Amino acid sequence: MNKHIIFGVHITDRFRHVPEAQSLFTEYGCNIKTRLGLHEVENYCSPNGMILLEMYGDEVRCLELAEKLAALEGLEVQKMVFTHD
């Protein structure tokens, strides 16, 4: 059985908190298959945003990234896991 792991990372005050998160994205870059950034842009550029990460590789290493991101100020991490044969 394979697992398809996706993290949703909510970032508040992204201009202040993204640099630390970006450092972790770089460190774990080989485990990030897809990265999608979302933020509100109508009438203004929102200071808050959402990043979706489709993970790849060793599950322990992927979960390690989630723990490190969640430990950063201004970030919240939610996990989705889909299993399939």
Feature roles, as predicted:
Residues 1-85:
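Long, contiguous binding/interaction regions
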